[in-house]
């Protein structure tokens, strides 16, 4: 992880290697903490695959420094940056415009500098949808259970709303679940809430999506998949460990399982395509990401 000064020195060297200062596009991710981020791995692998004059760094930015960081990135000539916790909502006042996806999600994970204006976008939900579509069709026939009603669940539910899939929200705090249902309905989607862990709805589900951060240890996860039909798709947005206890239970019950690595991949791919207005080298980015996680 570079400091800004180290980045400036690196930028000059990189620019010269491509024929002159000013030819390189610069991107980054900001958050706190940020050392664990794998975004630079996949983005830089993509630039290398296409021989693009671009680079991607990660910068730790504390909440109190967010405003200065936004101004600094713009002043330093960055073409765009990703935003991760805890800044996805607090960055909104520093932006000039929001895309429909950002408005719908109420949060931003991608910023593009366009003729001096800062455009906020959200690729979390669309990244999840793109990864999900590799495993199932999305339309009004699908019954999808979403476990949780936090930020991740909101982004996913709002991205699924336009497909008219039947969403069932299950949350341990019913009030938050009801709030998410209302948001989906407000945007024209189909959703209702069921009691946390209600097996009857699990038996009907085509897909179950686990969006909470709990449950890395089986004894900590207050939910059972008992009653789910074999062959259903079960997704956990966590990707480390590769198979959470939740996914292990689903596999034992005969379900198809998917972790969150492709959600991470496709939110990055969608950010790339938003910034560069061109197709990203998905397989090169996927390979780099998988190698970074599995060695």
Predicted features and spans:
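Glycine-rich adenosine-cofactor-binding loop
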Residues: 31, 120-122, 132, 136, ...
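Phosphate-coordination loops involved in phosphoryl transfer and adenosine-cofactor binding
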Residues: 24, 140-143, 230-231
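Conserved beta-strand positions in the Rossmann-like core of class I SAM-dependent methyltransferases
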Residues: 57, 168, 258
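NAD(P)-binding Rossmann-fold cofactor-contacting core
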Residues: 163-185
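Phosphate/diphosphate ligand-binding glycine-rich loop within oxidoreductases
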Residues: 6-8, 13-137, 241-243
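Rossmann-fold NAD(P)-binding glycine/threonine-rich loop
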Residues: 232-282, 286-288
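Rossmann-like adenosine-cofactor binding region
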Residues: 187-257
